[in-house]
Structure formats: C-alpha cells, structure tokens
C-alpha cells in the first residue's frame, strides 16, 4: 500500500464526519489488521479503481449506526431499516467521494464505485492477503472504524 493515500483519506473522512455531526471527532490509534479482524454489525465498502485497487470500508456497531441516522435525517431510528442502511451507505459515499478527490488532487487517478454492504464471510473470503489500515474515530454517535485497503496495480 502506498502510505501517501492514508493521510488525505483520514483528513477527508474527519472533515465529512465533523460536518455531518457538528462535533469534535477524535482519532484513535492506527493499526494494521487482516480482513477477518473487521468485526461489527454494519460494514459498507466503497471500492476504488485506478492507480491502485482497493477500497474504504466503514464499519460500526448497531447503536452507532442508529445514532448517525438520527443525526443525518432528523428522524428517530430504532431499527436498522432499509432507510437507515441507505443513510449509512450515503455517509460512506460522502467519505469516499471527498477522500478520492483529495487523493486525485495529489496527482493520482482514482474513481469510486457505488457502495455495497459486506458480510464478515465475504470479507474473509474476498482477499485473505489484503492488508488493512484501521483507524477508529470516536464521535458523539459512537465509534466508527475507517479501514483503508489498497493494492498498487
């Protein structure tokens, strides 16, 4: 993975979350994990293509997702309805769009694909060789984990 992708991805992510949540976002410690270590109730991936191949995986627990949906829509969600899942996918899309623009501004060439949800089994069988940089972000809605997985073409 090219490390120069990580900083613009994280800066863009923090800006989007700050804008959406209107509160301070704190970054936890960066760690290198394997796909099978992603563990949460919800995971949404935005695949990236171009100079490198990979994706941004945003994962979180159920309560965090519901809290984010409440903030983003102004409605009170009590269950992970299709609208709630679409809201989390849209947040992931906003993160990926801003991050891709920031990386492309550095002279790289990336495009994003539409978001898709993943099961833990799909993560484990999709690319067992993949290295993932995981960064926990602490928000007023709960912990969101940003996972960056890229392979140079």
Q: What is each of the regions a protein language model found here?
A:
Residues 1-153:
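N-terminal auxiliary interaction/assembly segments of multi-subunit proteins
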């Amino acid at each position: 993975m090219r490390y120069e992708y990580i900083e613009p991805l994280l800066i863009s992510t923090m800006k989007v979350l700050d804008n959406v949540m209107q509160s301070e976002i704190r970054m936890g410690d960066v760690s290198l994990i394997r796909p099978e270590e992603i563990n949460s109730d919800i995971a949404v991936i935005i695949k990236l293509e171009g100079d490198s191949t990979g994706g941004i995986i945003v994962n979180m627990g159920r309560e965090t997702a519901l809290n984010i949906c409440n903030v983003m829509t102004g409605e009170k969600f009590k269950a992970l309805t299709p609208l709630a899942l679409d809201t989390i996918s849209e947040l992931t899309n906003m993160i990926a769009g801003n991050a891709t623009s920031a990386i492309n501004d550095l002279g790289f060439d990336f495009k994003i694909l539409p978001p898709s949800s993943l099961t833990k089994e799909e993560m484990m069988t999709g690319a067992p060789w993949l290295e993932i940089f995981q960064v926990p972000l602490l928000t007023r809605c709960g912990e969101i984990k940003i996972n960056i997985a890229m392979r140079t073409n």
